Design a protein with these regions (language model features):
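Glycine-rich flexible loops
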Residues: 1-181
Length: 181
């Protein structure tokens, strides 16, 4: 198996884990940066539980589909702009964890109160207050700026973005984030 095939397998697996863990239903997506390229691998608009390593898209940080067939998720800008802003990030999870969404709805956030939470956030996770879907480059840039150098960002009434060094770590931290909430 080539490194590219392994990365694609990991992306598909991470999306199915997100679904199995209850972090997403029909919507949500996990991606991975392609090493040495200003591009990332992400599923199409299909449900994350249907993610297949053979049917992923390669997208640029400018939002263009470079490889693959199918429509990209309208919120692929989340991934594109986090990768553009953060060279240290190799995996991004955009999920809709129920407890995180509930906290953000009441103006609260996730704090590092126990082991799992402390792994994800050393301080309270910031909350992106805008309630729109992140469907443009500008909104993607705003969300990436709100994340800053952190690992997790709650999206008020919407979900959470988790950024890590690779896709495997990103999905594990997304699970930890919901547990901490």
């Amino acid at each position: 198996m080539t490194a590219d095939e392994a990365l694609r397998r990991d992306v598909a697996t991470a999306n199915r884990i997100a679904h199995a863990a209850g972090l997403v239903t029909a919507f949500g997506h996990v991606s991975a940066r392609l090493p040495g390229r200003d591009a990332f691998v992400i599923p199409t608009r299909a449900s994350p539980m249907l993610a297949d390593a053979e049917r992923l898209l390669v997208m640029s940080f400018d939002g263009d589909v470079l490889e693959g067939e199918g429509l990209p998720n309208s919120e692929a800008w989340i991934h594109a702009r986090i990768y553009a802003a953060r060279p240290d990030v190799g995996g991004v999870a955009h999920v809709h964890p129920p407890a995180c969404v509930a906290l953000s709805q009441i103006g609260a956030t996730v704090r590092p109160l126990h082991n799992s939470g402390a792994v994800v956030v050393q301080q309270a996770a910031p909350v992106y207050e805008r309630i729109d879907l992140i469907t443009t480059r500008d909104l993607g840039d705003q969300a990436a700026a709100a994340l800053g150098a952190g690992r997790a960002l709650l999206l008020r009434g919407h979900g959470a973005n988790v950024a890590e060094s690779d896709v495997r770590r990103a999905i594990v931290l997304a699970c930890f984030l919901e547990e901490a909430a």
